[in-house]
C-alpha cells in the first residue's frame, strides 16, 4: 500500500503508527494549501521578502532563492517556511494579481 494519496500527496496513517497527530497535522496543512486555490501571483520567480502566512504562488520557469529548482510548482508559505506541490492538469487557481481564473492544461496555465 502506498504511504500517501495519489493526487494531493496526503499522508496515510500507518497501522500501529506512533505520533499519529504528526501525520494528521501534515495532511491538514497540505489540504489548507491546496484546496480553494487562490494565488498571490502566477509565473512568479522571486520569493517575497516577508511572505504572509498561507501565501501561495504559482512558480514560473526559472525561480530563484528559496524557490530555486521548483519551476512550475505551487509554493506555499506555512509555519515559517516554503513547501511545494506539483499541480496536475485540470487544476483551477484564482490569480489575485490579475483577478483571473486559471486552468492548468498540458501546455501550462491559461485563463478560463
Q: Residue locations for each model-derived region?
A:
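Short loop/beta submotifs within extracellular cysteine-rich repeat domains
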Residues: 65-66, 82
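Extracellular "spike/adhesin" assembly and maturation modules
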Residues: 1-63, 75, 79, 87-112
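Short glycine/proline-enriched turns and hinge-like loops at secondary-structure junctions
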Residues: 67-71
Amino acid at each position: 500500500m502506498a504511504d500517501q494519496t495519489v493526487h494531493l500527496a496526503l499522508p496515510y496513517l500507518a497501522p500501529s503508527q506512533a505520533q499519529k497527530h504528526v501525520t494528521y497535522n501534515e495532511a491538514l496543512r497540505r489540504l489548507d494549501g491546496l484546496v480553494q486555490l487562490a494565488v498571490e501571483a502566477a509565473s512568479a520567480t522571486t520569493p517575497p521578502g516577508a511572505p504572509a502566512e498561507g501565501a501561495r504562488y504559482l512558480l514560473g520557469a526559472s525561480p530563484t532563492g528559496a524557490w530555486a529548482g521548483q519551476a512550475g510548482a505551487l509554493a506555499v508559505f506555512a509555519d515559517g517556511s516554503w513547501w511545494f506541490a506539483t499541480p496536475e492538469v485540470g487544476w483551477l487557481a484564482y490569480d489575485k494579481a490579475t483577478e483571473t481564473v486559471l486552468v492548468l492544461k498540458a501546455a501550462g496555465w491559461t485563463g478560463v
